[in-house]
């Protein structure tokens, strides 16, 4: 029993020992991979794989290895090389390098490289040694030597250690250059010695080449040295001029200017002065100069000589030879430049003078010289008319312009304009507002020559050469050559004798060329006047007058149409019919009489009815016949259809329809209203007075005009009733009833006499209402 208990104790002790003893078991590679994979999936572990994928490492350990590589490489490590050495992807290396640089102020990340302060101190020592050897160094040289950015070298290396490791100073004018004080002293000594030995002007570049000093240092130290001379500028081609030489130059220039009052740039440049203009300004700071291309003229010479002579020339109406008052060594180009510059600077009007080969002519002198040419232009114009030359010229220009008009129409064929819209409305059979009025060029199928030579142009016709038409196929017409009635040779013959007396006959052709175009235009204008004065041109004037009259009537119809559209449909139809029977009939008569005149038909009665116009149209030429007949039919149709028919007639007559200018509508309406008011003041017949008053009130209230006869007065009063107060309506209604009573009663009856007395008493009130009523007093909204 005791042995069993001992056995139990022994087993318990073994069991306890087994529990307390740690057992080391070696896992297989597969198990390790599975464990690591599981940890990665549960994001309990972060590792970085190598490029071959066989190994991995934690980011912290990789960071330590990057720092070790930085230390091994002497404080400067290229991340690409580190990536190859550690066999880790470059992007991982760059991320950790940025973290290292951010966490450690002594480490810098520069262009894919890690650089620590030890390396910076090392290159600072190298820079200091180089600066001591050379005396001067620039950041660009250091950037090339150390393969580092210039900004990094300047701010984090040189400027940071300047005065500590690097013994030198920074150039104030160029912060990217550094030098030692000893170097500056050596440069000063070289410059001082070189300048002391110079006795004549010499290029600064030559001096710098001899003494081996940089140009920027030379110019910065020059003022400190205070040499016995001066440098012309800080540019590449500057010169050093000793004071003794500069004094000799100044004496010569001063002496020459005092004697001649001008200076030549070439003479100054021969003295060794490169910029003559700047030297003159510097040498004579209180003098005013007129700087030309080759010379500089003093203000004394310009004011006292040239300007005075020009003023005298203008006052005496003569000419001035500038070569006699300017220095003899000035060329013709110099003299012309003097004249042009004086005209600009002195604010003179160049049109008062004419410059030719060194001689200035006043305009009155030339006008007197060419005075005989006016008679020449008159005689040439008469000869052109008598010989038919001008008429032939007009015919050619007429044909050329018609060709241009045809081309313009072809180009406009594809455009949808207001004519198309109106044509659609007319075809739909709806009456209403026309949209006529745009300016459209039309051409006849027959060449109309109104008069002997188709006088289709004004006196402006003799301007430039007419341009050829631009057809779609590329064909172009030949340009019409301008008519030359007065030629240069004709003017030369007239003025040569006068110029020979002054010894200026060599200028006869240039002077004649100046006035050829002027007198030719004068002759053409005179020829046009003579041409228009002939009986053949009366038809052209009639054409223009008819065209203007028709356009005016069409504009009136358009404005009246807006007013009648405000009425109910039944009243509107009657107003349209009345409008066409009155104004439309007038348009038909005007065009029918014009066409009859074109076709050489005799018309005894000018007030034609529809049958007479139809009969007349049958006798006209075929190109007019259909259009006139259609226009007569359109009088019984809508306004749109009538306007389209009228447009066709105008086209056959080579007339244009003026473009609608709605900005002028208000002016036309206001003018129409003023005319009605004037008639109202002069009217004493009750029925007409009421008619005029109703039309005026309608225009004031609606802003539109109306063309209506007396039978529409009641409809007009009914339309405007809502815009008048009770007293005004009662006045008009009472006056209307009295007018009807007078019209219905016999003239001599007591009823008629009594009604006339009442009308006479109320006349002043009706007139005042029509004259003084304004839209501001309208009780209802318009």
Curated annotation (Swiss-Prot):
Recorded GO MF terms: UFM1 ligase activity
Enzyme category, top tier: transferase
Entry GO CC: endoplasmic reticulum membrane
Organism superkingdom: Eukaryota
Chain positions covered by the region annotation Disordered: 405-478
Database matches in InterPro entries: Ufl1, Ufl1-like_C, Ufl1_dom, Ufl1_N
UniProtKB keywords: Transferase, Ubl conjugation pathway
Record GO biological process: protein K69-linked ufmylation; regulation of proteasomal ubiquitin-dependent protein catabolic process; response to endoplasmic reticulum stress
Pfam families associated with the record: E3_UFM1_ligase, UFL1, UFL1_C
EC number: 2.3.2.-
Sequence similarity: Belongs to the UFL1 family.
Biological role: E3 UFM1-protein ligase that mediates ufmylation of target proteins.
Descriptive protein name: E3 UFM1-protein ligase 1 homolog
Annotated organism of origin: Drosophila sechellia
